[in-house]
Amino acid sequence: MSDNLDLVRSIYADWERGDFRSAEWADPQIDWVMADGPLQGTWTGVAGMALGWREWLSAWKDLRVEVDRYFELDEGRVLVLTRGIARGAASGIDTGEMRAESANLFHIRDGKVTRLVIYWESRDRALADLGLEG
């Protein structure tokens, strides 16, 4: 297993425990990108990523991320197919459980994630963007 894959696995170990605060793995100028979903955009830097995470996480309670599969790609990239399971927190109304088949694309250089693209609603879009089949 490569160092890049080990790094991404360690990030998911944190996320699977609900720890979305640690950022030792992130390059100081990371681009954190939400490609789709209710919160779309790009946040730059560790502070920007933290702001994006806070905005994103405030919409959900009991968010869990489960990994289906890891793919080590070329050029320091790792694609992870995931499932997100959560309950909506907006307006205090229980919206029921939400499930999403998602994908996250990590760009890694010198042991740090320089770009993280989150495809919350469509792993098929991630696969298509990368020229892979779903």
Each predicted region: which residue ranges?
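C-terminal and inter-domain tail/linker signature
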Residues: 1-134
